[in-house]
């Protein structure tokens, strides 16, 4: 993985001052992580709990001298959300549930409708890339796949979206 000098300096600071590093992480990622988890759970109380748990785990990692970054936090948050959904015995824990909720709320309905037509893995990749603005390497780290796989899936998902939009325009 290629690490910028800025990221390397941040990692060194994390090891030296875990409290300061945690504050830095919270400033940078707390709101974004809350939004991501809310899109998965649709439960504000659960989101607050899981964000707190994710940052607690980040602090524990920092105290052990291990670096923590945004993709790591998202991975922890996502895993906590999946665990929460399993505990609640929800039948559908995949990303399609999230997309249905988003479409029902309005906003960019065409985009959400188009995302619903994609396989849930592709829709999740597009969400992380387009909405949360993560780089392909970060998404790969979060999902445990190779960056090349992320790029390939993003390309295919964009092609499917393009075809959906073209079909919608042809019908109009």
How should each PLM-predicted stretch be described?
Residues 33, 37, 73, 77-85:
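Hydrophobic-face residues of short alpha-helical interaction/recognition segments
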């Amino acid at each position: 993985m290629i690490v910028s000098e800025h990221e390397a300096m941040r990692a060194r600071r994390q090891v030296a001052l875990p409290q300061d590093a945690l504050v830095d992480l919270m400033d940078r990622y707390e709101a974004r992580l809350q939004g991501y988890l809310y899109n998965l759970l649709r439960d504000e109380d659960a989101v607050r709990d899981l964000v707190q748990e994710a940052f607690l785990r980040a602090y524990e990692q920092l105290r052990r001298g291990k670096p923590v970054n945004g993709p790591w936090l998202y991975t922890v948050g996502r895993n906590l959300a999946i665990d929460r959904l399993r505990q609640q015995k929800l039948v559908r824990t995949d990303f399609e549930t999230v997309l249905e909720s988003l479409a029902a709320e309005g906003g960019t309905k065409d985009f959400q409708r188009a995302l619903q037509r994609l396989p849930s893995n592709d829709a999740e990749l597009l969400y992380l890339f387009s909405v949360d603005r993560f780089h392909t390497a970060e998404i790969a780290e979060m999902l445990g796949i190779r960056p090349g796989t992320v790029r390939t899936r993003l390309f295919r998902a964009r092609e499917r979206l393009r075809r959906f939009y073209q079909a919608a325009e042809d019908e109009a």
